[in-house]
UniProtKB/Swiss-Prot annotation:
Residue segments, region Promoter-binding site: 249-256
Region Disordered: start-end pairs: 50-82
Organism of origin: Influenza A virus (strain A/Mallard/New York/6750/1978 H2N2)
Reactions accelerated catalytically: RNA(n) + a ribonucleoside 5'-triphosphate = RNA(n+1) + diphosphate
Keyword set, alphabetical order: Eukaryotic host gene expression shutoff by virus, Eukaryotic host transcription shutoff by virus, Host cytoplasm, Host gene expression shutoff by virus, Host nucleus, Host-virus interaction, Inhibition of host RNA polymerase II by virus, Nucleotide-binding, Nucleotidyltransferase, Phosphoprotein, RNA-directed RNA polymerase, Transferase, Viral RNA replication, Viral transcription
Function according to Swiss-Prot or TrEMBL: RNA-dependent RNA polymerase which is responsible for replication and transcription of virus RNA segments. The transcription of viral mRNAs occurs by a unique mechanism called cap-snatching. 5' methylated caps of cellular mRNAs are cleaved after 10-13 nucleotides by PA. In turn, these short capped RNAs are used as primers by PB1 for transcription of viral mRNAs. During virus replication, PB1 initiates RNA synthesis and copy vRNA into complementary RNA (cRNA) which in turn serves as a template for the production of more vRNAs.
Protein's recorded name: RNA-directed RNA polymerase catalytic subunit
GO molecular function, one term: nucleotide binding
Domain (RdRp catalytic) ranges: 286-483
Presence of the UniProt keyword Transferase in the record: yes
Length: 757
């Protein structure tokens, strides 16, 4: 039958139709090749926004630096970074006046965190610039390398395991005249293969010691490596993002802890909460403005967009904010927090891999590394690249560009939100001292501004005043990209508000489907996504049931596990049919083993193995949940795992799902080819690190794990824990006397070995 599509909307309020405007099907664009060009763009743009500032030279590194602060006043319309310190400080003072005690309390909370945080906090996070190897590494490896180098240079405060002590080492390292590091390098040589008699290239990995003088070390410590941001929809041009090294990370973490604590106490802040909590918080602000404006006032809302938020922020402003926020605190605390902005004022941007050239005629390819851009002949480059390089040359030192102004993406989200909220806070009537007043929402660089006034002129005046106040602290509201509406309809951080936040279900569409981790995780993630959308995104029962059926179909096609009684022929159908025939209770077979689907919208919260356990044949149970099965490389699975799901817009979200370990929870093996490259030494370090951590977690399962207080090494902690556990097990009769004696003996041996070492 033909359906007239307009009939679908007869009963639907207009705002709920937003899901039908979904433009993002298909894969998002990814970047290929080098990010050098994008990084040069960022550096050049940032300097352009602050070009009227003062130039100085860093005495330690010789880097030229531009300081736009307290220089010329900003102009209308043109984005700029000319923030005025006294304006920022005044905004902070008013913020504190309207929220008595907010800074004091946040400082106390942060101080506690600073004293308790362990250095392993820095192992969280993905790619990190590893200054010892001058390239990106997984965070845990980069930290291990840094600590190893510190210790070999006589910096040992970090051995206490507290982050603050590691940071003491960082500070000391910057005063050293030289640092000795170990770098990996590879030798290639041509040898004849005995079997095939062909010439092959053999690679061997070496480690060599290298000394860095103070200047070279400082440059590396202040370097942010850059990459291209992937999977950004709705943009024609890619852009660069930064990954800081281990020296900067710890300091940034503490500053963000303080700022997060402040944001939690500010009703206008969209961070650090998310999801429904965020919607509730924001709806309150809107409700407040609408209730006050009902009788006499007009109320308008701007869906705001700021021009180049990061590139116009300035670390010097953040230093001023921190100095003010912590003004009554102990000296050591103020020092720890002011280091991050100081390092950012002196930061260097690494230009990435450089450029690739190829000659079609001679079939040659050659890489021009970023280090060579300072003095290579520019005739090889096209017009636009030539301009970029010419512009950036005065700033280059050792393949990195001096970048004093600007913040780089994603570094101080919380602190910059505090700055934004402080301007929203100035909109109260007692501060504007006139008929208009404003309030709003801020989340990093995204904002919504609600202005109330008795007439349109008042609204216009209010918007103008807000715009100019922002300018004074380096925030540039874009007049072109912001739009104004009667209050009640606006968008903020991809939430659409229309008399309440509208569920935009289509945003979640890309996360429906089979993730491709393994049969067990994929089934669990798939049903959890549907469950979560029923809870949070108005996914109705009928649609959910349909989504579930489509998911099961998709899953069966992905893993070629159609039901045992199907006619579809795949590579697996022969085995699955055989299993089907010899199984007594066919309902007990998992979908991935050709079984039927028992999920419906009522039982999505139950893992499939649990759902079918009572229905399974006994021998099938034994095969399915058999940790000794030799064909499965077994992941130890906690009861809850985390999956990364991609909404259409905004950052990848982490989603918890129930994980039951079965023989379907396999992990694909690591590609072997890595073992022949210079990564090999690093891979071995990483595996060792992993093994140690896994072992430690065996001794301290997360439920009983209290952060170790006092100073003891991992080994000492594990030995003492083993002794305690053994005694308890022995006294309760769980282990025999001989076993107890053996455990004690092993513990003593370990301690003896440590003493000898």
């Amino acid at each position: 039958m033909d359906v007239n599509p307009t009939l679908l909307f007869l009963k639907v309020p207009a705002q709920n139709a937003i899901s039908t405007t979904f433009p993002y099907t298909g894969d998002p664009p990814y970047s290929h090749g080098t990010g050098t060009g994008y990084t040069m763009d960022t550096v050049n743009r940032t300097h352009q926004y602050s070009e009227k500032g003062k130039w100085t030279t860093n005495t330690e590194t010789g880097a030229p630096q531009l300081n736009p602060i307290d220089g010329p006043l900003p102009e209308d319309n043109e984005p700029s970074g000319y923030a005025q310190t006294d304006c920022v400080l005044e905004a902070m003072a008013f913020l504190e006046e309207s929220h008595p005690g907010i800074f004091e309390n946040s400082c106390l909370e942060t101080m506690e965190v600073v004293q308790q945080t362990r250095v392993d906090k820095l192992t969280q996070g993905r790619q990190t610039y590893d200054w010892t190897l001058n390239r990106n590494q997984p965070a845990a490896t980069a930290l291990a390398n840094t600590i190893e180098v510190f210790r070999s240079n006589g910096l040992t405060a970090n051995e206490s395991g507290r982050l603050i002590d590691f940071l003491k080492d960082v500070m000391e390292s910057m005063d050293k005249e030289e640092m000795e590091i170990t770098t990996h390098f590879q030798r290639k040589r041509r040898v004849r293969d005995n079997m095939t008699k062909k010439m092959v290239t053999q690679r061997t990995i070496g480690k060599k010691k290298q000394r860095l003088n103070k200047r070279s070390y400082l440059i590396r410590a202040l370097t942010l490596n850059t990459m291209t941001k992937d999977a950004e929809r709705g943009k024609l041009k890619r852009r660069a993002i930064a990954t800081p090294g281990m020296q900067i990370r710890g300091f940034v973490y503490f500053v963000e802890t303080l700022a997060r604590s402040i944001c939690e106490k500010l009703e206008q802040s969209g961070l650090p909460v998310g999801g429904n909590e965020k919607k509730a918080k924001l709806a309150n602000v809107v409700r407040k403005m609408m209730t006050n404006s009902q009788d006499t006032e007009l109320s308008f809302t701007i869906t705001g967009d700021n021009t180049k938020w990061n590139e116009n922020q300035n670390p010097r402003m953040f230093l001023a904010m921190i100095t003010y926020i912590t003004r009554n605190q102990p000296e050591w605390f103020r020092n720890v927090l002011s280091i991050a902005p100081i390092m950012f004022s002196n930061k260097m941007a690494r230009l990435g891999k450089g450029y690739m050239f190829e000659s079609k005629s001679m079939k040659l390819r050659t890489q021009i590394p970023a280090e060579m851009l300072a003095d290579i002949d520019l005739k090889y480059f096209n017009e636009s690249t030539r301009k970029k390089i010419e512009k950036i040359r005065p700033l280059l030192i050792d393949g990195t560009a001096s970048l004093s102004p600007g913040m780089m993406m994603g570094m101080f989200n919380m602190l910059s939100t505090v700055l934004g909220v402080s301007i929203l806070n100035l909109g109260q009537k007692r501060y504007t001292k006139t008929t208009y007043w404003w309030d709003g929402l801020q989340s990093s660089d995204d904002f919504a501004l609600i202005v109330n006034a008795p007439n349109h002129e008042g609204i216009q005046a209010g918007v103008d005043r807000f715009y100019r106040t922002c300018k004074l602290v380096g925030i540039n509201m874009s007049k072109k990209k912001s739009y104004i509406n009667r209050t009640g309809t606006f968008e903020f951080t991809s939430f659409f508000y229309r008399y309440g936040f509208v569920a935009n279900f289509s945003m979640e569409l890309p996360s429906f489907g089979v993730s491709g981790i393994n049969e067990s995780a994929d089934m669990s993630i798939g049903v959890t996504v549907i469950k979560n959308n029923m809870i949070n995104n108005d996914l109705g029962p009928a649609t959910a049931q349909m989504a579930l059926q489509l998911f099961i179909k998709d899953y069966r096609y992905t893993y070629r596990c159609h039901r045992g009684d199907t006619q579809i022929q795949t590579r697996r159908s022969f085995e699955l049919k055989k299993l089907w025939e010899q199984t007594r209770s066919k309902a007990g077979l998992l979908v991935s083993d050709g079984g039927p689907n028992l999920y419906n919208i009522r039982n999505l919260h139950i893992p499939e193995v649990c759902l079918k356990w009572e229905l399974m044949d006994e021998d099938y149970q034994g095969r399915l949940c058999n940790p000794l099965n030799p064909f499965v490389s077994h992941k130890e699975i906690e009861s809850v795992n985390n999956a990364v799901v991609m909404p259409a817009h905004g950052p990848a979200k982490s989603m918890e799902y129930d994980a039951v370990a079965t023989t379907h929870s396999w992990i694909p093996k690591r590609n072997r080819s890595i073992l022949n490259t210079s990564q090999r030494g690093i891979l071995e370090d990483e595996q060792m690190y992993q093994k140690c951590c896994n072992l430690f977690e065996k001794f301290f399962p997360s439920s009983s794990y209290r952060r170790p207080v006092g100073i003891s090494s991992m080994v000492e902690a594990m030995v003492s824990r083993a002794r305690i556990d053994a005694r308890i097990d022995f006294e309760s009769g769980r282990i025999k006397k001989e076993e107890f004696a053996e455990i004690m003996k092993i513990c003593s041996t370990i301690e003896e070995l440590r003493r000898q070492k």
